[in-house]
Structure formats: structure tokens, C-alpha cells
């Protein structure tokens, strides 16, 4: 949960591995995500696997924010990475911040939207920050990159273009954020921010921008599927009053699923009873009575289910778009010799 402007938001986070061997895990996650925070190293910039994962995100048209991490490391260069995201990934990457210092002198950022400096406090390990004037030696650079930001936003929203040419500083924070959000949802602009997750610097401002710019499940017009018998196209809207539809792990796209209820697996044609539902937090399982449109949860009770299966209300069957995976380079199965070893193997693998 994250508190932002007196509102409490529930954020379902799926952390995907960055190594090439686990590209399939990224693909599985992108299929059910509404928005994405794409991590880059401030030292290494855009890497080959970054390009692969970016293309996967493009395939699913997932709106995204770029977070340039490791600003405290030797060789960190935020603007170099922003340039690489533009040139190598072909995106309209726009800096929303400029770092105050770099490497061992990285202390904060300049917020280009609000024209303010932010310094994270060392005494509480970055849990809080202090607003400060923009350093004098950065004023010229800040003015240049703020104008680039406002020009990009005004270029997307024609209603702001005239106002931008008359007086760029007349654009309000809300006007900038609203236009920027629309551009992000349209995948026309990729906002770029920076920080050091190890030192807890920049994470808070990044999460605030997630609330402002990335889509809520309720922003979706709905998910398209097909009727398993007739092949007719169906649209399921993110509404708890719609018939239930989900993909197993599970991501709910419409309706509401109660523990103890039955769902139809449209691949197998079997009905499955959902005995229990959990909200996952790392390796902790918190029992919950139901999930509804937009939620992600884990369920117990399946007898026959595969990744990409569609689960739905038996009275309103639908097949959602599944997932396509590349053939594995090598196949290997691990299984316990005895039932007693099953729990031990689970602990070892986790």
C-alpha cells in the first residue's frame, strides 16, 4: 500500500528477473500488468537484455516509467542513460528529474515539474526528504531540461501548445501531470527518473509518479476475449458487477471471485472449486475472502491448470488472450523422490 495525497493505494508488484535465461518470466508478467517501472543501471545503461524486455513490453503495449538506479555508483550518468533509451530503444524518453550530484556525492534530485530541489535525509536512511532551492550551478541546466519537458508535454496536448509558446511557466503542475499521464497511457512518452534503491533515495518520488502517471486497472476499457463455443468476441470491463474472468496465478480482469466458489477453466472445460484465496506479500500468504477486478492473488484448489489458462464464471464463458513462449533451449525436471521430500524441495527452491 502507498499513501499519496491523502489517498491510500493498493499496488500489486511483480518483480521479474533481468537475466536472459528468465525472459519467459518477464513475458508471463507483462501479459497481466497494467503499468511498468523499467529499471536501468546508471552505470551500464541500456543492456542487450534491456532491449529484449523493452520489445516484450511493446508487444503488450504496457505504459511505463524509466527508473535509472545506482546513481550512487562510480560512473553513474543519468542523462547518458536517458539518451540511450531514446536512441537505442526508439522511445520518447523525457527526464522529469535531474540528479543533484552523482556517485558518492549523489544526495537528491531536482523536480523539473515543480522546479524544486529534493534532498534525502541521511539520519533516517532516506525515509524522509527536505525541499531545498535548486543549486545555483544547476540553474541553467534545469531551465534547459524543464523546457524540453514542457515542450514534449505541450507537443502531445495541443490545448497546452499556445499556452506554452506564450509563457512556458504558466503551465500548472496539474496541467503538466494530466497531459503527461495521457501521453504515458498512449505510450507516446516515457518519463525518466533516477535514484539509488540501495540507499532508499528516489524510491518515494518514483512511487508518487506511479500513482500519478501509470494506469489503474479501472482505467482499462476492458479485456477482449472470445466465446469458447461460438467464437464471438466478448469484452469484459473492470467492474465487480461483470461476470468473473481471470488468468491463473491469478489476475482478475472483471467481476468478483469468492473463496469457496466455482470457476470454469475454458481450456480443459472443467469446473474448479476455489477453496482459498491469498494476497501474496513476498513469501507471506495472507488469507482474503475474495478478489475483484484489478486484483492479483493466489488461489488454492486447482486440480488441472496451466499458465495462461482463462478462469471465468461458468454461466458466462470467455477465453482471454493466452501467452506464447519460445521453445526452451534445454529441458530439465526436478521432482522429490518421496512425498516427505516435497516440502523440503519447496523450501530449497524458494
Model-based region annotation:
Residues 1-350:
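Structural and coupling elements of P-loop NTPases
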Amino acid at each position: 500500500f502507498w499513501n499519496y495525497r491523502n489517498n491510500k493505494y493498493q499496488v500489486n508488484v511483480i518483480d521479474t528477473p533481468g537475466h536472459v535465461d528468465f525472459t519467459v518470466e518477464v513475458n508471463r508478467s507483462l501479459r497481466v500488468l497494467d503499468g511498468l517501472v523499467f529499471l536501468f543501471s546508471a552505470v551500464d545503461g541500456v543492456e542487450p537484455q534491456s532491449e529484449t524486455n523493452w520489445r516484450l513490453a511493446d508487444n503488450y503495449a504496457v505504459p511505463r516509467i524509466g527508473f535509472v538506479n545506482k546513481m550512487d555508483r562510480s560512473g553513474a550518468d543519468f542523462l547518458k542513460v536517458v539518451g540511450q533509451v531514446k536512441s537505442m530503444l526508439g522511445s520518447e524518453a523525457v527526464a522529469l528529474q535531474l540528479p543533484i550530484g552523482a556517485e558518492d556525492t549523489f544526495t537528491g534530485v531536482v523536480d523539473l515539474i515543480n522546479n524544486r530541489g529534493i534532498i534525502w535525509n541521511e539520519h533516517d536512511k532516506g525515509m524522509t526528504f527536505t525541499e531545498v532551492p535548486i543549486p545555483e550551478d544547476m540553474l541553467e541546466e534545469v531551465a534547459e531540461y524543464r523546457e524540453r519537458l514542457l515542450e514534449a508535454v505541450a507537443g502531445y496536448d495541443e490545448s497546452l501548445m499556445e499556452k506554452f509558446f506564450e509563457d512556458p511557466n504558466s503551465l500548472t503542475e496539474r496541467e503538466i501531470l494530466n497531459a503527461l499521464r495521457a501521453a504515458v497511457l498512449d505510450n507516446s512518452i516515457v518519463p525518466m527518473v533516477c535514484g539509488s534503491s540501495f540507499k532508499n533515495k528516489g524510491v518515494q518520488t518514483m512511487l508518487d509518479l506511479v500513482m500519478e502517471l501509470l494506469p489503474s486497472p479501472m482505467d482499462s476499457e476492458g479485456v477482449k476475449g472470445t466465446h469458447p463455443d461460438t467464437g464471438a468476441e466478448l469484452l469484459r470491463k473492470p467492474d465487480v458487477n461483470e461476470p468473473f474472468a481471470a488468468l491463473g496465478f491469478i489476475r482478475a480482469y472483471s467481476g468478483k471471485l469468492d473463496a469457496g466458489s466455482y470457476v470454469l477453466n475454458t481450456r480443459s472445460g472443467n469446473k474448479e472449486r476455489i477453496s482459498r484465496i491469498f494476497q501474496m506479500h513476498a513469501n507471506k500468504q495472507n488469507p482474503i475472502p475474495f478478489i475483484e477486478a484489478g486484483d492479483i492473488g493466489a488461489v488454492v484448489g486447482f486440480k488441472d491448470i496451466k499458465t495462461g489458462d482463462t478462469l471465468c464464471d461458468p454461466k458466462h464463458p470467455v477465453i482471454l488472450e493466452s501467452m506464447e513462449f519460445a521453445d526452451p533451449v534445454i529441458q530439465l525436471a526436478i521432482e522429490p523422490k518421496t512425498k516427505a521430500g516435497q516440502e523440503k524441495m519447496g523450501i530449497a527452491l524458494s
